[in-house]
Amino acid sequence: MTETRPNRLLDAIDTPSDLKGRSRADLKQIAAEVREEVVDVVSVTGGHLGSGLGVVELTVAIHSVFDTPDDKLVWDVGHQCYPHKILTGRKDRMRTLRQGGGLSGFTKRSESEYDPFGAAHASTSISAGLGFAKSRDLQNKDNHVICVIGDGSMSAGMAYEAMNNAGADRSRMIVILNDNDMSIAPPVGAMSHYFSRLVSSRPYRGLRRIAKKVVQPMGLESPARRAEEYLRGFAMGGTLFEEMGFYYIGPVDGHDLDTLLDLLENIKAMQDGPILLHVVTQKGKGYAPAENSADKYHGVSKFSVVTGEQAKGAGGPPSYQKVFGQTLAKLGETDDKICAITAAMPSGTSTDIFGKKFPDRHFDVGIAEQHAVTFAAGLAADGMKPFCAIYSTFLQRGYDQVVHDVAIQQLPVRFAIDRAGLVGADGATHAGSFDIGYLGALPGFVCMAPSDEAELARMVLTSLEIDDRPSAVRYPRGEGVGVVIPDLLKPLEIGKGRVVREGTSIAILSYGTRLQEALKAAEMLAAQGLSATVADARFAKPLDNELIERLAREHEVLVTIEEGSRGGFGSFVLEHLANCGGLDAGLKVRVMTLPDVFQDHDTPAAMYDQAGLTARHIAARAIEALGRGDLSAIERLASA
């Protein structure tokens, strides 16, 4: 529950309608209290802090002026939605944010009528908003559609595809560009430079006095220049957005609540065509530790409100991300053709480790996965050795490029697929569930998954040495298992797995980091006198057919397990066994995958338990297939 404090106006705000009729002074106090609440909440739950702090005044202004949920408010990505949730009937549940059974960290249709469209991936808001606008027109309704998109999301082509459509169609909608010059990493590319020019170009001296009436000082080097650029563009039609058919207003101070309220009231009354309001905000606004941090506290763990110091976990093995980055950087010392590519995630993927050593060979292309893939293909086509590091969930955005530009041409692009499997607090939108199936379907691809951090290091080297076709290594978020990574790495033999424990009646074939759970399951089975072989597949493509056939021939039961959806590794194994006659002698096969649902957020451990992919689940499936053994004993061992 949110703590009730004396004289706190926010306690009386249950829905946006409670903002109506409030004085400007009240709204400013409510904004200050929302900012304080966001800091308090995220200090307890962890999450995305800086983005929300930057849009507090904008959020209060939008909900004060417009009539949500009848007016449709679509947030891009959703990192900045915490103030919105506080004002739309969810403030009493904010401390469940990103917790199992609690509020999502993003907008979510099933959570509230004030979330008309779910978000988590970038650059979708304008397309969705245009859909709402056209639906409104076709149904002869009269509501407004407002999309809020950050400058980082404007590096993706989808945003411009939607603007091109909306501008040509003259659809009545409002796009608010939240320009904080900071997505997760600093924005890159020509569009980022364009926004910078918009807010810093040489002022027209004759407009200075008028400009200062539009935007009051906000602590920037020359605040009036932002408004002057708008006035210059208004008079001369001089902005990219106007060329695309939008009526452009801005840049304006996104923290000046009076200006925002006045502008939005005027914009609300405009009835012709699409409008783009360009607001300039400061990520982390109002909380000094965030303002002074390089990443503006984009994503944080629990922290002290007083000092801003984030909680640190107990020291443990290095993360898979760090192992990838360190291995690539080490290989880069002896091979100057290695390049690293990331789509706005240099620190998340740890390509920044490589980039610090070799800045000329490190490319952050912004939120542009399609471009990242084909850019890597171009590098590979001319003899370079690109590693394209992208989260599994985001690689989906560039799948056509993977097929058309990489796979068909058999170009040796090396994909480092981060955040494979279940990721925890970010939930279904960020789960890396599908890459095993969608890459395994492509002719010629080499698909690998390590069982531990040493295996990952070897697979990075193995990818480097594959120079005649594309390859991919998938690995999860989080720490390794604590094995030692040898100084001298040796590449793997392509398409060959390994047996890590020999047994007789049951075979467990693991692809990826569920191997540790498979070994625990083997111990549980051994406690009942059941002998289990445990094998590490290493490759989903090409399969180790010799190993699979041996496991089928020498055991009564074969269980496959993977951190991916149906239609992946287990399906490949089953298809091979069916075609080679491996099922003809009565082998019992059980395929263990992620369930056929989109799982809600929770801790990764809880999510894998819900998915049925822990040691006790593996042992239970083996006993069920074998037809002997004590299932209740497995439960007792698991809870011991």
Curated annotation (Swiss-Prot):
Which UniProt keywords are listed?
Isoprene biosynthesis, Magnesium, Metal-binding, Thiamine biosynthesis, Thiamine pyrophosphate, Transferase
Pathways involved: Metabolic intermediate biosynthesis; 1-deoxy-D-xylulose 5-phosphate biosynthesis; 1-deoxy-D-xylulose 5-phosphate from D-glyceraldehyde 3-phosphate and pyruvate: step 1/1
Its domain of life reads Bacteria
- Required co-factor? Mg(2+); thiamine diphosphate
Which HAMAP family does the annotation name?
DXP_synth (MF_00315)
Write down what this protein is called: 1-deoxy-D-xylulose-5-phosphate synthase
Q: Name one GO molecular function term.
A: thiamine pyrophosphate binding
Q: How is the cofactor bound?
A: Binds 1 Mg(2+) ion per subunit. Binds 1 thiamine pyrophosphate per subunit.
Annotated organism of origin: Hyphomonas neptunium (strain ATCC 15444)
UniProt-listed NCBIfam families = dxs (TIGR00204), PRK05444.2-2 (NF003933)
What family name appears in the similarity comment? Belongs to the transketolase family. DXPS subfamily.
Oligomeric state and interaction partners are given as: Homodimer.
* Binding, thiamine diphosphate: 79, 120-122, 152-153, 180, 287, 369
Query: What is its EC class?
Result: transferase
Which function does this protein serve?
Answer: Catalyzes the acyloin condensation reaction between C atoms 2 and 3 of pyruvate and glyceraldehyde 3-phosphate to yield 1-deoxy-D-xylulose-5-phosphate (DXP).
Entry binding sites for Mg(2+): 151, 180
* Reactions it catalyzes: D-glyceraldehyde 3-phosphate + pyruvate + H(+) = 1-deoxy-D-xylulose 5-phosphate + CO2
UniProt entry tagged with the keyword Magnesium:
yes
| InterPro entries, sorted | Dxylulose-5-P_synthase, THDP-binding, Transketo_C/PFOR_II, Transketolase-like_Pyr-bd, Transketolase_BS, Transketolase_C, Transketolase_CS
Q: In its UniProt record, which GO terms are filed under biological process?
A: 1-deoxy-D-xylulose 5-phosphate biosynthetic process; glyceraldehyde-3-phosphate metabolic process; terpenoid biosynthetic process; thiamine biosynthetic process
Q: Recorded E.C. number(s)?
A: 2.2.1.7
